[in-house]
């Protein structure tokens, strides 16, 4: 299937939908590929039309989840914890493409990448590998730049996680709204600190084509803490 057909099919499939991020960092009780694969399958059973995964579980998580679920997989690696670390290099993009992901997610901020590449070069590598690419951005300006560079999906994933924008308590709705104004024709995904259905509904209302939720759905520790805090 050529890229244009892939893109059109995914846009139709994901418009107005919830994508679930299934990840766990090193040291987390859920940091086990087998466990996260079952979590991803449960999310699909619950209606998730796509899964975002990989992160510190890397290619092993992507391969395992891609083999288990029959929905598109947005794959990424996390390499380190400072600067650009989400699928940060051309080699990282190629590796995710070869792991079975449908879409590769990569940092599209204006910060320097470890291999000196530009985001536009990552787009080229992804497309040459036969895979679509999602831009993880921190500011509306980065969303615009990534869209111009050829990203198939643009997102607010990193809003509040770089020095260019303060971290909001919940989702950065202003970032999402401003990004929508700058890229009216892009497939814009809201991500980052969406923790309840009201957040998701508001994100859609102000212009997101789809919303990604992770921790609030897939982290039992976070969910338990939300309930426990009401009783203390």
From Swiss-Prot:
Its EC number is 5.1.3.9. It comes from the Bacteria. It catalyses: an N-acyl-D-glucosamine 6-phosphate = an N-acyl-D-mannosamine 6-phosphate. InterPro entries: Aldolase_TIM (IPR013785), NanE (IPR007260), RibuloseP-bd_barrel (IPR011060). GO terms for cellular component: cytosol. Gene3D superfamilies: Aldolase class I. Keywords: Carbohydrate metabolism, Isomerase. It holds the Pfam family NanE. One of its GO terms (molecular function) is N-acylglucosamine-6-phosphate 2-epimerase activity. One of its GO terms (biological process) is N-acetylneuraminate catabolic process. Pathway: Amino-sugar metabolism; N-acetylneuraminate degradation; D-fructose 6-phosphate from N-acetylneuraminate: step 3/5. Belongs to the NanE family. Converts N-acetylmannosamine-6-phosphate (ManNAc-6-P) to N-acetylglucosamine-6-phosphate (GlcNAc-6-P). NCBIfam families: PRK01130.1. This is Putative N-acetylmannosamine-6-phosphate 2-epimerase. It comes from Corynebacterium glutamicum (strain ATCC 13032 / DSM 20300 / JCM 1318 / BCRC 11384 / CCUG 27702 / LMG 3730 / NBRC 12168 / NCIMB 10025 / NRRL B-2784 / 534).
């Amino acid at each position: 299937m050529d890229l244009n057909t892939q893109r059109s099919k995914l846009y139709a499939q994901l418009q107005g939908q919830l994508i679930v991020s299934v990840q766990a960092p090193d040291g987390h009780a859920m940091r086990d590929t087998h466990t996260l694969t079952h979590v991803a399958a449960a999310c699909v059973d619950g209606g998730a039309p796509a899964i975002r995964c990989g992160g510190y579980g890397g290619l092993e998580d992507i391969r395992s989840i891609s083999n288990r679920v029959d929905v598109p997989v947005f794959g990424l690696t996390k390499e380190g914890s400072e600067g650009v670390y989400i699928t940060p290099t051309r080699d990282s993009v190629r590796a995710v493409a070869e792991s079975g992901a449908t879409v590769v997610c990569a940092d599209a901020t204006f910060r320097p990448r470890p291999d000196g590449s530009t985001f536009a070069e990552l787009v080229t590598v992804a497309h040459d590998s036969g895979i679509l690419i999602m831009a993880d951005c921190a500011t509306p300006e980065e969303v615009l730049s990534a869209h111009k560079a050829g990203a198939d999906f643009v997102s607010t994933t990193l809003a509040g996680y770089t020095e260019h924008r303060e971290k909001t308590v919940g989702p950065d709705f202003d970032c999402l709204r401003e990004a929508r104004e700058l890229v009216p024709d892009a497939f814009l995904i809201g991500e980052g600190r969406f923790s309840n259905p009201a957040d998701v509904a508001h994100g859609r209302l102000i212009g997101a084509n789809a919303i990604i939720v992770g921790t609030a759905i897939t982290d039992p520790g976070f969910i338990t803490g939300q309930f426990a805090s009401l009783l203390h």
